[in-house]
Amino acid sequence: MKLMKLPSEFQKALPILKKIKEAGFEAYFVGGGVRDILLDRPIHDVDIATSSYPEETKAIFSRTVDIGIEHGTVLVLENDAEYEITTFRTEDIYVDYRRPSNVSFVRSLEEDLKRRDFTVNALALDETGQVIDKFHGLQDLKRKELRAVGKAEERFQEDALRIMRGFRFAASLDFKIEDETFEAMKTHAHLLQKISVERSFIELDKLFMAPNWKLGLTYFIEAQAYNYLPGLENRQSELTGMMDHFDAHFVFDSSEQAWANMIIALSLDKEKAFLKSWKTSNDFQKQVTQIVTLYRKRESALLSKMDLYMYGKEAAILSENLRKAKGLPTDFNHMMRTYDDLTIYDKHEIVVNGRYLMEKLNMKAGPQLGHLLKKVEKAIVEGTLANKVGDIEAFIMKELENE
């Protein structure tokens, strides 16, 4: 198969391939970028593989950076762009079900392509637009089928993360997973215990954000991969429930919303502990927890001024959008009116602070002062106290009299 025209991203990189060829080596576009051209999808990466060894690659170009030279990768800076150029390689026995014990550089494109995960990712493209297909990847693209390169058992035994990648590709490409490949994924799902949680999180997160996330999640559940990931053991029915009520074309607004949906489906009450077990950032944990909290509050009442002040408009919209997607009653107008009616959006907008009260009212730092400031903040947010110095002083004096 030959492409009549290369996309602009690849055309811009053609001088790189030509320079390598002029130096006497082979060079091809490889990986997901080639697959995405053939599927008429947006191109995110332009990866180049070559028969030149790293030192030979560096000799061809004037500006290079060693970013992974032990694995054969050199970053080339050319034409105001950066390109990762990797030497054809083979890999020895894998350790930890993730990393090869040794990488050997080779001159053969086929040897390089045979170490790839799936046939649709094992395609190469030369500078003329000719597609090199050593493992029937074009046929699988046409069939919309995900198939492991070579023996599926070996591919997942080598690198168990490929199992999660398979679910993710099914979701992002809307591809069926070929039967033998899927059986091997099921058989080796237990190896996911050996993979770093951070890497599994990245793949599951990409799955959730894919257009056909339900398909990917269905494969994930059928393979029982959930049993080997944090907080999901024996939660098949709840995970299946994650897909309930959404129409076929629903996609999540954000990763935070997607993970909030999972927590809600799992009926977890220790959201942060669950998210921490996935080694997510504190900021991510906070945002997901806000969405979950607001979603649960909405099960019994409309959101109050204090709810919107504490958790913010963005989390409230994501929560309400989740309700809408599930066919539950929503009230965006009330929510936005309530938010717009807030007199402050942050405690730093209050016209007095602890230092002022200590000086003006001769108060001492401590729990009493902190408690009073919380009362002031709450009263201002709820609209029962004006954010004015005199009003706040009078409010505090009255509170002190009542204590």
From Swiss-Prot:
Enzyme class: transferase
Named cofactor requirement(s): Mg(2+)
GO molecular function: ATP binding; CCA tRNA nucleotidyltransferase activity; magnesium ion binding; tRNA binding
Binding site for CTP: G32, R35, R116, D159, R162, R165, R168
Keywords: ATP-binding, Magnesium, Metal-binding, Nucleotide-binding, Nucleotidyltransferase, RNA repair, RNA-binding, Transferase, tRNA processing
Catalytic function, reaction form: a tRNA precursor + 2 CTP + ATP = a tRNA with a 3' CCA end + 3 diphosphate; a tRNA with a 3' CCA end + 2 CTP + ATP = a tRNA with a 3' CCACCA end + 3 diphosphate
Gene Ontology process terms (BP): RNA repair; tRNA 3'-terminal CCA addition
The protein's Enzyme Commission number: 2.7.7.72
Keyword ATP-binding tagged: yes
Cross-referenced Pfam families: PolyA_pol (PF01743), PolyA_pol_RNAbd (PF12627), tRNA_NucTran2_2 (PF13735)
Binding locations of ATP: G32, R35, R116, D159, R162, R165, R168
Residues where Mg(2+) binds: D45, D47
Protein origin, superkingdom: Bacteria
Protein family membership: Belongs to the tRNA nucleotidyltransferase/poly(A) polymerase family. Bacterial CCA-adding enzyme type 3 subfamily.
Quaternary structure note: Homodimer.
Reported function: Catalyzes the addition and repair of the essential 3'-terminal CCA sequence in tRNAs without using a nucleic acid template. Adds these three nucleotides in the order of C, C, and A to the tRNA nucleotide-73, using CTP and ATP as substrates and producing inorganic pyrophosphate. tRNA 3'-terminal CCA addition is required both for tRNA processing and repair. Also involved in tRNA surveillance by mediating tandem CCA addition to generate a CCACCA at the 3' terminus of unstable tRNAs. While stable tRNAs receive only 3'-terminal CCA, unstable tRNAs are marked with CCACCA and rapidly degraded.
PANTHER family linked: CCA TRNA NUCLEOTIDYLTRANSFERASE 1, MITOCHONDRIAL (PTHR46173:SF1)
Miscellaneous: A single active site specifically recognizes both ATP and CTP and is responsible for their addition.
Protein name: CCA-adding enzyme
Organism of origin: Streptococcus uberis (strain ATCC BAA-854 / 0140J)
Source organism phylogeny: Bacteria, Bacillati, Bacillota, Bacilli, Lactobacillales
